[in-house]
Each structure stands twice: as C-alpha cells, then as structure tokens.
C-alpha cells in the first residue's frame, strides 16, 4: 500500500476537465491511494474549459455556480492539495511545451512523484524522469496502477463513486460506457472482467 505522505501526484487540467475522469481520480484520492495536488492556474484552466463547453447550451447560466461549487468542494475535501507557491521555470524543463511548464513547476514545488495528464506529447517525459524524477502518466495507466496496488480497495472506490451518483443514478453499463468515452479503456476493461463486474 502506498503511503500518501510519499506518493504525491499533480493532476493536470485536462485530467480534471472530463467529469468521469475527475470523479474517478478524486474518489481514489479520497480513498487514500495517493495525495492529489493542483495549482490555482490548473484550477483556472479546467474550470474555464468546462465553462466554454456550456457556453452554447441553454444551461450556460447555471454552469458557472456549479463549476465554482465543484472547485470549492475539491479544495475543501483535499485541503493540502492546492500548491500556492509555484516555482519559476527552470532550465531543466525547456523541452516541455511552454503552456504546460507551470504544471511541471507545480509538481516540483509539491515534490510530486508524478503528473497525470492526457497530453503526454507535451511533456518531455524521459527528461522529467531523469532530471527531476517526476513520472508523466496517462490517467488510464495511472488508475490501473492504483487498481493493481489493491484491487479490493479499488473496487470499493468504484462502488462509492456509483453510490454518489443519484441524480440521475449511473447503471454499471453507463459507468463503463462513460469510462470508455473518456479514454479510460483499461480501467473499463478491468471493471468488465468476469470476477469484478458482478461485485460492482
């Protein structure tokens, strides 16, 4: 079992933007698989992108307070997650895409072990691991790694996630479909396995 005092992960904005990915990642953090970290800028990016998605919909006026409530709940649930003193850029990250360097520096400030992001190509993964000892992981790979640590606790986390989805409730099939659509294919495959699915 990982110690949350040692295993710290920065969640990039793109991993917090899709609802089901955010919910799974935060549920696993709540079940103490790892310690999540983010910055004000990361918060601003995912909330802005989510607001843009609702901009052309009739629910746009209702979206802003809901998004703000989610952000507030995240900071309240994980009071140590917000990294307030992000370090200035260093020469060790020149190969990282300019728009993502703040994520790396958040990880450095947080002494994080990993960054979870869908934008793997924008991070110089080998360089970060060699020079800063920070891994860059796709959310699906990261979640599967957590599952492999303790499958029983992972199943409990997914059961907890489903139990909180009441308006409307999520069926097992809907959860699996949402995971696949969000790019969590390996995670969905594990949940769909013959020995796990009946317990979900």
Place the predicted regions along the sequence by residue.
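Short His-Asn-centered micro-motif
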Residues: 11-13, 117-118
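PIN-domain endoribonuclease scaffold, especially VapC-family toxins
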Residues: 37-83, 161-180
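Acidic, metal-binding active-site segment of PIN/NYN-like and related structure-specific nucleases
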Residues: 100-135
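Intrinsically disordered, low-complexity and often Lys/Arg-enriched segments
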Residues: 1-6, 196-200
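A generic structural signal for alpha->beta connector loops
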Residues: 33, 79-80, 133
